[in-house]
Amino acid sequence: SDVYKRQTTYNREAYYESMDIVATVEANATAQSAPYLNAEDIVRAREINQRMRELDIHHDPEEFTQLNKEFHSVLFSKCPNERLKDLVVDQWKQLEYHRVSTFRYVPERAQESTREHEQLVSLIEAGAEPAYIEKVARQHRLSTLNTYRKKND
């Protein structure tokens, strides 16, 4: 029905907006966190990313999504701005409200995503400029969103 169609369109737009906000705040929190991440954090991030690589995305998109959250949590964990960290988590909850495991719909994005994770970790490890880390982190999120949009619009 028309009402249903409008509702779905609205929900989809709301989901896109939440994804866009997450891309922005998460990337900023990651950039602020980067200088404070230590060797242990780097190892932890790589371990999670490795687990993501080994998962069968077609059978377990929810687990992949969960590990993705854990991975990004490590990267922004040392952000000195506590309210910004809270904002990221709040926006994640907004995404969960839509109950979309993005990777269920775009499994082809999973492999690419873990490669981008490694790139991010390497940049942080190398002490790259926070502004550059922020740009790469934001692009990483938006690539997932764009892949999802292409499939669903």
Residue ranges and their predicted role:
Residues 1-4:
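Short, small-residue-biased leader/transition segments that mark boundaries at the very start
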Residues 21, 67-70, 136, 147-148:
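Short, solvent-exposed amphipathic helices
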Residues 46-49, 53, 58, 100-153:
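C-terminal all-alpha effector/ligand-binding and dimerization domain
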Residues 40-45, 84-88, 132:
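Acidic/histidine metal-binding catalytic segments
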